[in-house]
């Protein structure tokens, strides 16, 4: 996995995956989190979360102030397994908002920046040369996407409107109702973990950029937006 498009935290995950080091995560949420007291917004809702904080959970910023409407949308994604996309201008804290919600739910979170360096192989996986018993062998190394959907993690795609077309069609597979991911090269069909969550952030509304502010952004396939 090419870690050039992800955060330092996610580079650690990529390293562990490439070295086949076991990544330990809790399997399911085991507590309820009160929205009013946790996020300081006027709501009587409770949402599920984890009591155990792992190294893959973002650090809490105690000074962070939560916008009510955006926070409730993100919480709906966590609680009801909804795909959530957040649109806004650069520097408005879209990704940070998702991370800070995840931090208070102790929900493992991975961020991937969909710039031009992230390829289809980075997401799905590729053959790599490994050393076993003193011999070099070719072995398939799973990408970040197959690993993520099989675990209770929140996967965040930053700059969603800058993704390459081949990458976007890979992502479209997991936007379906059942969210299955087919790995044709491996003859495998992966079903998502019941606590896998998917989020995205974007600068535009999916119709491309006519302002000149966001060079490199693309129009998002309407089939994806409908999902």
What are these regions (language model features)?
Residues 1-16:
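N-terminal amphipathic/basic-hydrophobic helices that include classical n-h-c signal peptides
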Residues 15-227:
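AAA+ P-loop NTPase catalytic core and its hallmark functional loops
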């Amino acid at each position: 996995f090419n870690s050039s498009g992800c955060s330092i935290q996610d580079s650690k995950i990529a390293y562990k995956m490439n070295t086949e080091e076991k990544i330990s995560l809790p399997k399911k949420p085991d507590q309820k989190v009160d929205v009013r007291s946790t996020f300081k917004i006027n709501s009587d809702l409770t949402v599920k979360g984890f009591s155990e904080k792992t190294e893959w959970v973002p650090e809490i910023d105690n000074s962070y102030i939560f916008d009510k409407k955006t926070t409730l949308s993100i919480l709906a994604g966590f609680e009801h397994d909804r795909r959530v996309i957040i649109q806004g201008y650069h520097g408005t804290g879209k990704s940070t908002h998702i991370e800070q919600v995840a931090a208070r739910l102790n929900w493992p979170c991975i961020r991937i920046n969909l710039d031009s360096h992230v390829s289809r192989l980075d997401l799905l996986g590729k053959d790599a040369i490994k050393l076993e018993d003193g011999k070099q062998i070719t072995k398939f190394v799973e990408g970040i996407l197959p690993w993520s959907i099989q675990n209770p993690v929140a996967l965040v795609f930053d700059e969603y409107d800058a993704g390459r077309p081949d990458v976007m069609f890979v992502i479209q597979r997991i936007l379906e109702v059942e969210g299955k991911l087919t790995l044709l090269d491996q003859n495998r069909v992966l079903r998502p973990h019941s606590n896998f969550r998917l989020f995205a952030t974007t600068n535009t509304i999916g119709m491309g950029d006519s302002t000149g502010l966001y060079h490199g952004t693309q129009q998002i396939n309407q089939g994806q937006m409908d999902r």
